[in-house]
Amino acid sequence: MDSTTEKNVLIIGGPNAGKTHFGGQLYGRLNSRKFNYKIAPHNRPSDLTIFQDVLDKLSEGKRAGHTEASANRSIELKLEDENENKIVFSFPDYAGEQVKSIVENRRINAIWKQYIDRSDSWMLFVRIDEIHPLEDIINRGIPSPEEIQKRRVQTPPVKVSDGAFFVELLQMLLYVKGVSTFNKINMPNLTVVLSCWDVPTFPENTIPSEILMKTLPLLYYFVKNNWAENSHSIIGLSSTEKTLSDEPDEDYIDRTPIDFGYIINPKGEKQEDLTISINSIVGK
């Protein structure tokens, strides 16, 4: 009797949320066979070029370019541990454009529904350095006479706050999966990933959940109030450890991409092995 298990992790995030570098760095670590997890040899996907392209760029000391909308295809990264338990990281929308469309159009297509139905765990990528505070009567400046006149002629569009966007997204995914919020959610396991953690230069031992509570309180309390304590986590992630550009970075050239990158675990501790987080992501 086969005692191995398979877990399915759904990767969720909009454009420029950090999924590209995460996928490439995870792929590089799995390929190196230096860690507890490896790419499943019998289920190796035929098309992993998008991950390899990221690694090639990083090996040159350059950032990987923004994934084009034309790359909105489904990608799966299948791995297994030393006991041959399998984990599938699914990227149904690698470029992230469809995530925006889901919320804007209140519609989830058939491909997304398949991935949602079979998922055990979700990774929600939130790029923490691009969260914009919502203007209100307290922090909004007085508009100029020209701006007032412009608003009289054309009413500005209503902008949904970042927190409301993510909450709406999670509510739609839960609805499609048939998960009620009347009771605390145990499955799917949820990991909120605060990506590009290195950009804001947080103090050492900063707790990721505290940052989420300050920057996106609506999302923070939605997660805290609806998921069971042992079925969700909030972590920080820097896939590249430093900001890269189109100019070569000598440190990356002298070393290898898998020597860079780290996570900040829920306790605020820095861990350089990105694969360490896999157990908590799948709810082990």
What are these regions (language model features)?
Residues 15, 79-81, 95-98, 194-198, ...:
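Short, flexible loop/turn elements at secondary-structure junctions
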Residues 6-8, 72-74, 86, 119, ...:
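Extracellular structured ligand-interaction cores
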Residues 24-30, 96, 108-109, 139-143, ...:
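Amphipathic alpha-helical scaffolding segments
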Residues 66-122, 129-138:
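Switch II of P-loop NTPase G domains
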Residues 1-69, 84-89:
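Conserved G1/Walker A P-loop phosphate-binding module
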Residues 114, 121-125, 130-284:
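Conserved GTP-binding G-domain of TRAFAC-class P-loop NTPases and closely related GTPase folds
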Residues 3, 104-107, 215:
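Short, glycine/acidic-rich beta->alpha junctions
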Residues 59-78, 160-177:
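Alpha-helix-centered segments that form part of catalytic cores
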